[in-house]
């Protein structure tokens, strides 16, 4: 069986779901179920047992087979991310942490310097660190070297729906990484998830494309199927591209004639 391996944790699904932007917790839960996802990311601010309408941890923790990956969204420095990670681990008991540090709310690009520092500290404290980064092959390798469980380069800007605008750099990261590469952010269509998997990504994380659709549960199922199809295609091996046409049938002896 072809599984996603993150440190000592094994998942049969290669689709990871984000839980923001949904119209309600009920809609989000239906999408999670339809997606088949086993790893789900939740912002620290959604761990709120005092105000149940804001709490996603409770409902998600009741779903069988779901592992939570808290994230540090909202942090603008390494210190803030480290603090959020430790609070999240206390609340959830999960060893996973998605390090997400984007100080500029206009473009939401991840801060590479603060991300590197937070990842280094958290990995040394026993977290399974999953850093959200720009598609920078050098940074990805450095994060691997400090002990991250995976790297999560963006396909394009968060919520932009611009797809795999960073495909060229993603290809380099995939080729040079010894840890899983998970495309995170910017995917709009299931076909883009399939393409990411065909490139050799280990998994994809999707949120806005599902939450903002007219039918989130149906879109989640579509991403489930396309992610699986892309992975199967990658494992099977895509045919090589050619600059010229290559005949699929013989061009000689047509109806007994010799060319």
UniProtKB/Swiss-Prot annotation:
One of its GO terms (cellular component) is cytoplasm. This is Thiazole synthase. The active site is at residue 98. It is found in: Cytoplasm. It catalyses: [ThiS sulfur-carrier protein]-C-terminal-Gly-aminoethanethioate + 2-iminoacetate + 1-deoxy-D-xylulose 5-phosphate = [ThiS sulfur-carrier protein]-C-terminal Gly-Gly + 2-[(2R,5Z)-2-carboxy-4-methylthiazol-5(2H)-ylidene]ethyl phosphate + 2 H2O + H(+). GO terms for biological process: thiamine diphosphate biosynthetic process. Pfam families: ThiG (PF05690). It comes from Chlorobium phaeovibrioides (strain DSM 265 / 1930) (Prosthecochloris vibrioformis (strain DSM 265)). It is an enzyme of class 2 (transferase). Belongs to the ThiG family. Pathway: Cofactor biosynthesis; thiamine diphosphate biosynthesis. GO terms for molecular function: thiazole synthase activity. Keywords: Cytoplasm, Schiff base, Thiamine biosynthesis, Transferase. 1-deoxy-D-xylulose 5-phosphate binds at residues 159, 185-186, 207-208. CDD domains: ThiG. The keyword Cytoplasm applies. PANTHER family: THIAZOLE SYNTHASE. It comes from the Bacteria. The keyword Cytoplasm applies. Catalyzes the rearrangement of 1-deoxy-D-xylulose 5-phosphate (DXP) to produce the thiazole phosphate moiety of thiamine. Sulfur is provided by the thiocarboxylate moiety of the carrier protein ThiS. In vitro, sulfur can be provided by H(2)S. Its EC number is 2.8.1.10.
């Amino acid at each position: 069986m072809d599984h996603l391996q993150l440190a000592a944790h094994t998942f049969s699904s290669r689709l990871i779901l984000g839980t923001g932007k949904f119209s309600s917790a009920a809609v989000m839960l239906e999408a999670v179920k339809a997606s088949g996802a086993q790893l789900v990311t939740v912002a620290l601010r959604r761990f709120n047992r005092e105000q149940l309408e804001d709490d996603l941890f409770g409902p998600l923790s009741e779903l069988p087979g779901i592992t939570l990956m808290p994230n540090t969204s909202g942090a603008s420095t390494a210190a803030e991310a480290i603090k959020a990670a430790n609070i999240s681990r206390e609340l959830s008991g999960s060893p996973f942490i998605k390090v997400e540090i984007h100080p500029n709310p206009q473009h939401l690009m991840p801060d590479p310097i603060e991300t590197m520092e937070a990842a280094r500290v958290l990995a040394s404290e026993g977290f399974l660190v999953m850093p959200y980064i720009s598609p920078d092959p050098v940074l990805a390798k450095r994060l691997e070297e400090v002990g991250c469980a995976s790297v999560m380069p963006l396909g394009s800007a968060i919520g932009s729906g611009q797809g795999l605008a960073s495909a060229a750099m993603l290809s380099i990261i995939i080729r040079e990484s010894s840890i899983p590469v998970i495309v995170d952010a910017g995917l709009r269509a299931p076909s883009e998830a399939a393409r990411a998997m065909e490139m050799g990504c280990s998994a994809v994380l999707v949120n806005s494309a599902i939450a903002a659709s007219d039918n989130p549960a149906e879109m989640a199922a579509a991403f489930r199927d396309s992610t699986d199809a892309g992975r199967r295609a990658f494992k099977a091996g895509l045919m090589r591209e050619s600059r010229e046409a290559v005949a699929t049938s013989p061009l000689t002896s047509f109806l007994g004639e010799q060319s």
